[in-house]
Amino acid sequence: MLTEKIVKRRKKETKILFFESNKEFSSDLLEEKYKDESNIYIVNDSAEYIGKYMKKYDIPWIDYIVSGLPFASLPNDLSSNILKKTQKYLKEDGKFITFKYTLLKKDFIKEYFSEVSVKREVRNVPPAYILCCSL
């Protein structure tokens, strides 16, 4: 549902990379669903390799990163690698937006950003937290 909203609200010239580590989901569902959409790239790989795909698809910087990664259950080194790459490639005025069902890793995420705001989304079941982060 989040993927659909992002696609629907984007400008046509906007390039979007969707990272999905589940091969069946990325190939069978996402690639098929968005095969006729220009500038949408489905990547079956870890988000920690974002630089490789930015180069491949000629994306010089990133305005927004929207993440549903379960940082609470990812190993710290993987989480750290992904957040370091986020710092590296996010535009100075860009935003990293992530949604969580727990705030367990909020302080960990805050280490990588100068500003982090938290909103609780009670319309989601279960309720979720949305962290909006700036460099």
Can you say where each PLM-predicted feature lies in the sequence?
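A short glycine-rich, Lys/Arg-flanked "PGG" loop and its adjoining helix->strand segment in the class I
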Residues: 79-92
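Conserved beta-strand signature within the Rossmann-like core of class I S-adenosyl-L-methionine
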Residues: 17-19, 89-102
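A short SAM/SAH-binding and catalytic strip from SAM-dependent methyltransferases
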Residues: 59-77
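Conserved class I S-adenosyl-L-methionine
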Residues: 97-118
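Core SAM-dependent methyltransferase catalytic element
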Residues: 120-135
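S-adenosyl-L-methionine
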Residues: 19-21, 25-60
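Conserved SAM-binding loop of SAM-dependent methyltransferases across substrates and taxa
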Residues: 1-13
